[in-house]
């Protein structure tokens, strides 16, 4: 999904900050998703989470870390595109 450069630059900033966080690095599933999000942003696209895996990964990370969530993950939650509703049959 194409997006404006301001949003893409913020996604790149948030993902690089998140990938430097030692607590986040321990969560392999979250690291994989953050890397995918970062690669999409490097190609001037916003990651579209059609399988809805990012939000549950952040939730698991938050629960595992005594409900502490880094600011960069909160901001990434709003930047990642997710389906708004079920699309039905095609």
From Swiss-Prot:
Chain ranges passing through the membrane: none
Keyword field: Bacteriocin immunity, Plasmid
Record carries keyword Nucleotide-binding: no
Alphabetical GO biological process terms: bacteriocin immunity
Function according to Swiss-Prot or TrEMBL: Imparts immunity to sakacin-A to naturally sensitive host strains.
UniProt protein name: Sakacin-A immunity factor
Organism, as annotated: Latilactobacillus sakei
Taxonomic lineage of the native organism: Bacteria, Bacillati, Bacillota, Bacilli, Lactobacillales
Gene name linked to the record: saiA
């Amino acid at each position: 999904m194409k997006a404006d450069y301001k949003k893409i630059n913020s996604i790149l900033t948030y993902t690089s900050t998140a990938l430097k966080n030692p607590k986040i690095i321990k969560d392999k599933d979250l690291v994989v998703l953050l890397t995918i999000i970062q690669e999409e942003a490097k190609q001037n696209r916003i990651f579209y989470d059609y399988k809805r895996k990012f939000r549950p990964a952040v939730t698991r990370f938050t629960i595992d870390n005594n409900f502490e969530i880094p600011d960069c993950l909160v901001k990434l939650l709003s930047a990642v595109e997710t389906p708004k509703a079920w699309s039905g049959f095609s």
